[in-house]
Amino acid sequence: MSESRTVLVTGGNRGIGFAIAEEFIAAGHRVAVTVRSGEGPKGCLSVRADVTDSASLDVAIAEVEAQLGPIEVLVANAGITRDMLLMRMTDEDFEDVVNTNLTGVFRVVKRATKGMIKARFGRVILIGSVVGLLGSAGQINYSSTKSALVGMARSITRELGARGITANVVAPGFIDTDMTAELPEEQQADYKKRIPAGRFASPQEVAKTVTWLAGDDAGYISGAVIPVDGGLGMGH
């Protein structure tokens, strides 16, 4: 981006969200992250918020805009998993994931885009997943929410595109995180065999894709799904 922007990243205290916030900070932007616990990277504003709680979001976004200015870039990253095979998954397992990963994104997008509409500029980037395109056994809840983000981004594009607002999905594949590092080596090797690139992505590779989408060079890209998966989900 050619000028400093106000960026909000939800779920910015670890993993991909943390890396995304770091990347925006390094590029000189004003960055806030929502967290339920912990803190975001050095140089950002960390605000306590739960995307399932509208009141906490109202307070958090008001604090961000009071300290950093109207939100110009939103990265909706906060998400949870409740993995279980279909026949064992409870209604609560399904509904909890939908409430965070889909309804939670709606709550944040609705609030953050108010200022974007007034400014006639905005970038909305939703963090999806390759399993939203491929499906995944034991993740009917999670994969359904990630697939739904594609429809959300495209509907935002149709509603708000004329106001200078873009909306896209970044769909990571397997990422090299503490969680994947704890998997048995044999299981890691099996996963890597499925990936044409033969390796997991780094969180920074996802973060750089997000910051590029937020920049001026990607201003004519909207309603797109950008895979960062080493070729795992190609054709979808």
Residues of each region from the PLM?
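Alpha-helical segment proximal to the catalytic Tyr-Lys
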Residues: 114, 158-162, 219
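Residue(s) in the substrate-gating loop at a strand-loop-helix junction
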Residues: 129
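Conserved glycine-rich cofactor-binding loop
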Residues: 13-14
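Substrate-binding pocket helix/loop in short-chain dehydrogenase/reductase
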Residues: 85-86, 93-98, 180, 191
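Active-site helix of classical SDR
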Residues: 109, 145, 153
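Short C-terminal tail/terminal secondary-structure segment
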Residues: 134, 211, 222-236
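A conserved structural motif in NAD(P)-dependent oxidoreductases
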Residues: 195-206
